[in-house]
Amino acid sequence: MKACSDDFIIAHTPEEAVDRLAALHQEATGALSHALKRYLKERIRPDASEHCLFRYPELRLTYLCQGEVPTTVRAYAKVQVPGTYAITVTQPAAFRKYLLEQLRPLMNDFTLRVEVGRSQQNIPYPYVVEGGDELAGSGVTAAELARVFPSTDLSAATDGTADGLYDWENIDPLPLALFDAARTDFSLKRIQHYTGSDWRHVQPWILLTNYHRYVDQFIRHGLDMLVGDSRFTRMVLPGNVVIERGMAEGEMQAIIENVVWHRYQMPAYHLQANDGHGITLVNIGVGPSNAKNITDHLAVLRPHCWLMIGHCGGLRQSQTIGDYVLAHAYMRRDGILDRVLPPHIPLPALAEVQQALQEAAKLVTGEEGDELKKRLRTGTVLTYDDRNWELRWAQERPLINLSRAVAVDMESGTIAAQGYRLRVPYGTLLCVSDKPLHSEIKLPGAAGAFYERAVTQHLHIGIAALELMRSQLNSLHSRKLRSFDEPPFR
């Protein structure tokens, strides 16, 4: 069989590189989609020359001039050692802004040879099937298609770079980014499955919550933004249902009432702006498994920040239901990431995020100084994987006491650990909904009054914090999240 040509061509500008990536990806997915439809209809197998087209494009950077130092202290777009860096790329047209943000400073500050061509990594056929209707009624099984077309290879979709599993002294080429095309495509499909949204709707500023009532408040906030004078232009609901600025309020309400969000495990809601800096809220439900699951997938979109805003149990006598907890440390008892990020590894508090949350609380509540301190407690959050941890209180008490924890939940430590691990700025602001150690538990009557008083304000603090960070984007991406062996791309 004749070997496939890789056709690598030097790109002289970032725009030229991304344009060629997009052209090669469109050619590859178009050829694969055409061959797949032809096989479903006529049972004609693709020949060897067609198979050569079913490959992801690859971006390569070769750096030979050791010792060049960038003019800024940014946390990304750096090459640390001479050599060739490479990554396969999927959906380059959709990721164009991100790719240019990485390539422009790299090509400006370093002497590089940038090349684009076809990789040796095949595109699995499921990643060109948009809705699944193409396979319905064809009489062809998935097993048969896997024998004819490239199929998903889970050994290729790994987090080896993010988890530092590669020996950088003996790998060639070096990784250019944390996630290659196969890993990215894997997550793009999962985002759609879990959230009920096309991944293209997800915004770079993300709120994660563990209570549906935050969703109700986010939708109300979104409607206010679309009706009033704001930078937001549309809101996308689960099932890719769109509400546009300019619609009548009655029409908006009718659309909302008919959204079938309960079909999706972790429904997502997207408040979008023309500049691409909108806000996404994901109701992740309860538990560290969900928290890890969704952040594994959202990370491939390279968001600017994710914040956990949800409820927690207050552990201190001085706390009152409705108070806030700003996490500055985490004691991880969730167990889910222990193999890749042992619990003794500290998760640094990111100053840019902490300051934004503190300032947002001040702006939204109108309180400051000692008055704000009465409502906003800073301290360690304990994250469990066992909702009934109280039944082991005698065994858990000594460790909780040593940790000086002020709150307990089931998601925050996992989300922060994922942010640290996957290099996404992270933060946590929780609201005390009960005090399990002081006989103040959630009761139906009290819960309604608590939600009415606290949830709206809490959500607005999270949104205000994201807006503050958006205005200071250049300083947000922290060097605290970079390892010694770090790919050039953010």
Predicted features, each with a name:
Residues 1-305, 313-490:
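Accessory terminal and edge-of-domain segments that mediate assembly/interaction
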